């Protein structure tokens, strides 16, 4: 009798396993929901570091007057003089 029963269970295992697993999962899901109770209020997520940096940079840009810029003539040379004149004696 047992060998016949095991043969039947082995043959029809895929057809029996899914409904049993479905019922067990549904019961477990509802039991967990019942024990836990209501869902807590969602917590507002903090901004990431990059988002805070972007906000800070935007705030800094809003406070500046972009029409007042330094002219190209007033800017320093491309390379500092110390690099170019390192081995040359100073001109007086």
UniProtKB/Swiss-Prot annotation:
Pfam families reported in the protein's UniProt record: UPF0767 (PF15990)
Membrane topology label: Single-pass membrane protein
TM region positions: 15-34
Keyword Membrane among UniProt keywords: yes
Entry's localization field: Membrane
Protein keywords: Membrane, Transmembrane, Transmembrane helix
InterPro entries xrefs: UPF0767
Keyword Membrane: yes
Recorded GO CC terms: membrane
PANTHER family reported in the protein's UniProt record: SMALL INTEGRAL MEMBRANE PROTEIN 12
Family of this protein: Belongs to the SMIM12 family.
Protein name per the record: Small integral membrane protein 12
Protein source organism: Ailuropoda melanoleuca
Gene (name only): SMIM12
């Amino acid at each position: 009798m047992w060998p016949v029963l095991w043969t039947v269970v082995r043959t029809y295992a895929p057809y029996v396993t899914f409904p049993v697993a479905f019922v067990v999962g549904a019961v477990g899901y509802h039991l967990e929901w019942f024990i836990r109770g209501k869902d807590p209020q969602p917590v507002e997520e903090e901004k990431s570091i990059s988002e805070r940096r972007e906000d800070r940079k935007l705030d800094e840009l809003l406070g500046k007057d972009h029409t007042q810029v330094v002219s190209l003539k007033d800017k320093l040379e491309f390379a500092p003089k110390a690099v170019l004149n390192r081995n040359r004696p100073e001109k007086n």
